[in-house]
């Protein structure tokens, strides 16, 4: 016989009872008032807050748990439904049997990912990019900019570094003082990223810098021109940080979650910190592709619970041009 979930009232803000239930990132249902209710806002390592009157259940971060809330305890009346894993070769995201390998065929992976991106866009789905500064360092700014322009990016999540080096590249053609086009160092180039931070402060924001006409290219230029939202989360090592960077970690988490809401696919580009953070904020039903030159970065993402992620061991500067080309080819034939 099915047992209704057990729950108890929170006695103090942010404090859970000893036997609270901790969620996975898989779709979860609770048996409440003799019927199954789907838990909304599914994420791993969260509490489940229920409303027995409205018959609702939602994942909640510890910081959002308040006195008087009803929280699920124990394991009675809880059903977890892991997503099905298709047999090898049947699904675009089942490239090879291992999740992360340096020996996967990049060309075929790119082709399958491109087909998925075109399909999601056609169905008015949501594609989110999580990006690190290596996008700029490796010369892939123009490729990501084109993807934004073509409507294949519906939100960008990053840190201070991607913005600063993107603006440095737009202003001076360098990234960390290295001429991106020729791969050579430049005179006094070590100060270039600080020049970028200074220009951002001078303008007051990315939006104002774009409006001023000082930059006319780049990832965040395209975001502003194409109304693509972005959230930049600060860290202790940031230069600046730039005016648009959110330095309150809790607020940054909230804004990341807003962008990730209803995402169909998340592409993670060379940023271990932000990729793992995002992995913790999405359900296992969201497709994830992580591209990084370092195999251990992708392995860490998988080890921390984002088991649905497919790891592509590649330099983003090599992978993004191939992906963009594949998207253009597929778009022409449809």
Where are these regions (language model features)?
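Structured alpha-helical segments in the cores of large, soluble enzyme domains
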Residues: 105-122, 297-302, 320
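Gly/Ser/Thr-rich loops at beta-strand to alpha-helix junctions
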Residues: 78, 132-138, 161-164, 238, ...
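C-terminal functional extensions of proteins
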Residues: 179-334
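Electropositive, gly/pro-rich neighborhoods at or near active sites that engage anionic ligands
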Residues: 1-93, 179, 184-193
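Active-site pocket-lining segments that scaffold enzyme catalytic pockets across diverse folds
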Residues: 117, 121-131, 135-149
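Active-site histidine-anchored catalytic micro-motif
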Residues: 127, 145-198, 268
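Short acidic, glycine/serine/threonine-rich loops at helix termini
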Residues: 42, 82-86, 139-143, 166-172, ...
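Gly-rich Lys/Arg/Thr-decorated short loops/hinges at beta-loop-alpha junctions or inter-strand turns
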Residues: 87-102, 197-202, 237-239
């Amino acid at each position: 016989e099915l047992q209704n979930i057990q729950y108890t009232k929170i006695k103090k803000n942010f404090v859970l009872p000893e036997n609270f239930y901790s969620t996975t990132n898989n779709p979860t249902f609770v048996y409440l008032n003799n019927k199954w209710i789907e838990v909304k806002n599914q994420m791993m390592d969260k509490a489940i807050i229920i409303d027995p009157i409205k018959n609702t259940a939602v994942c909640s971060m510890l910081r959002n748990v308040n006195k008087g809330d009803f929280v699920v305890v124990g394991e009675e009346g809880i059903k977890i439904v892991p997503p099905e894993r298709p047999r090898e070769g049947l699904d675009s995201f089942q490239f090879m049997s291992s999740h992360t390998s340096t020996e996967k065929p990049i060309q075929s992976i790119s082709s399958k990912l491109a087909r998925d991106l075109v399909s999601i866009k056609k169905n008015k789905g949501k594609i989110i990019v999580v990006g690190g500064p290596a996008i700029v360092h490796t010369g892939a700014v123009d490729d990501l900019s084109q993807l934004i322009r073509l409507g294949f990016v519906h939100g960008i999540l990053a840190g201070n570094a991607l913005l600063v080096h993107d603006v440095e590249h737009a202003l001076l053609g360098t990234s960390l003082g290295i001429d991106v086009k020729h791969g050579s160092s430049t005179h006094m180039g070590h100060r270039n990223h600080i020049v970028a931070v200074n220009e951002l402060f001078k303008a007051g924001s990315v939006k104002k810098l774009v409006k001023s006409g000082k930059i006319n290219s780049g990832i965040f230029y395209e975001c502003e021109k194409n109304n693509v939202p972005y959230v930049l989360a600060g860290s202790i090592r940031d230069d600046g940080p730039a005016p648009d960077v959110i330095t309150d970690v809790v607020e940054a988490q909230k804004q990341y979650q807003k962008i990730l809401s209803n995402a169909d696919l998340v592409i993670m580009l060379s940023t271990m910190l932000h990729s793992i953070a995002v992995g913790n904020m999405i359900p296992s039903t969201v497709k994830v592709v992580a591209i990084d030159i370092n195999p251990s970065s992708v392995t860490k993402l998988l080890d921390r619970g984002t088991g649905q992620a497919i790891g592509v061991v590649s330099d983003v500067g090599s992978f993004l041009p191939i992906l963009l080309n594949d998207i253009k080819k597929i778009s022409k034939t449809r």
